[in-house]
């Protein structure tokens, strides 16, 4: 949810840092391209580690890339590059989430098990589009909201290790 909220708030985050609306919108599109890169990278890496390792890795990289988005003031080319990195992490995270049940419990009853895992995550994620702007207003900036998202990602990192 942290990565989702920040991703959806990328345009106001980047305009707050001085980008034009058009360039920030292009950056959001390139974040989407980064998701494809992350999914392709996930497909080619070996999957021999313990099941919790991919989740911890993508969650840690989420916290790192969100922190960069929050703290780096510019220039635009660097912010866009960080956005692409965040997209790659988000893309890989999608596949990690999709394979989590099978990696831990096999493919028997995959649909039921994955549904149990995905249901609470889907409910929380549904609030992502509104939580980002609400937190930005409450904290005074989208950068502050992104820093709060880093905190959430770090809490998720602790839980991910014991999943």
Range-by-range predicted roles:
Residues 53-68, 150:
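Structural signature of the two symmetry-related core transmembrane helices
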